[in-house]
């Protein structure tokens, strides 16, 4: 029987000093025998996905106390990728994932917490907390802040759904008036919550449902809707029960590593492929698997991508479908239900809320549930009122979208595509693989070839695109932007958005050892491994070299002979200290924090996790 971790600091004569400090936080004699639950919050006024979390930690804390636990809240940092995008601030985004994971470990281990509720939402916060949960392996429940309502704007007399990607594309399109750009800007992000499409934040919050670590609805019910409050209330009660089951009944089934097993990671990746999730999820699932000592690799992702169809298409893959529409169609449990019927997931696995995923689907899949309350839950609709306040509206759709032939969520027979929404490509330019979001690629360019336009930084590529120096048929290649070369593996949302704004979204490709925002679409190939800074072949590409992409056959090929590549490699190595570094100087300032990250990070093919030798 494992002892409560917290008793290290709450029991015994020698802990009188520690108990004195606990008493100063409000604890009383009767509290020293209760489980201490960390409420890991991430409120900040910098991020719309987190502005409404300030009071939600205390909401969970009160429910923990009602259930017989002691709640102690702390906050992690949270970077807004959209605000950090397009300048050196993006160098800090991916490294912040490790900082978040470490900070959770530091706080939870330093204070001997028994379990935790993780209140996350945006891009690197959910992955960072997930990594910490699997690293610590103490009872954990995830509850996110929820998705933002989609924006609505009237242009030329027509109402259109918009998000921040539309604002970025419009701003760089000379044919769009200043007035229309401002109208889109003002409408794109109308409420608190994570941006409304299937971008990285929402993708990860959906995947926590598939991993079994979050309650049904976590990925899809809107931040503004009153129904979301129930998730926070339930999380507070559930975590106390889980702590007691583990520490008092020796029930290891509630531990993160028991729930998020190899098969659970397969389920999560299957979901991701089926809904065309962000390519960043590949990085984050690989990193979480590493922390949990789960042998889940790029090879598994490649294998799954070849058999899983696209059952759901959401912005940015399609313009007018957002998370509120996915929720109306049954949310993530609806997609998992279809994957289960197609025999593509293992529904026997446990979750934090049910004995098995199959048991959960019987209640939460709208195609099989007999519960009217569940059906009502999935009618939660946007309120259409600008607000930063959680749970502030209770609008409902008149009916569910249960059409699995033509609706938002399809069954396998009526899939949007028999080929999955993410793919791993291999070739001489990416020996260890690279990633493309196939759900966002137009069918006309699933095979594509063109001359390389080589850039040593994202900034240089942006200048060329906006300067009209990129032509139809070009392959924009951006290198030295990987985990080590950036450092920090910047997102390339601006280059992909600007290609769209120039009318080149279906006429050009972009390949990089950096990564893409969940908002990126088009023929955008990222995570090229090995990266240029590690001696990858992407560092040997020269202007005009032909690069060919064959997504159906999972291939990418640099049309340069092996002998020529070896000659170029030898010439590069002869540069000594200047080898495998940008040829042109870059103005970015690399601080000590970024240097420390670069010194220990690994390849994107490994999730860009940090490895420190013993």
UniProtKB/Swiss-Prot annotation:
Disulphide linkage map: none
Positions carrying N6-carboxylysine: 124
Alphabetical list of HAMAP family matching this protein: IlvD
The species this protein was found in: Nitrobacter winogradskyi (strain ATCC 25391 / DSM 10237 / CIP 104748 / NCIMB 11846 / Nb-255)
Gene: ilvD
Protein name in UniProt: Dihydroxy-acid dehydratase
EC number, UniProt record: 4.2.1.9
Quaternary structure note: Homodimer.
Residues the record lists as binding Mg(2+): 81, 123-124, 491
Residues that coordinate or bind [2Fe-2S] cluster: 122, 195
GO biological process: one example: isoleucine biosynthetic process
Coiled coil: none
Pfam families given in the database record: ILV_EDD_C (PF24877), ILVD_EDD_N (PF00920)
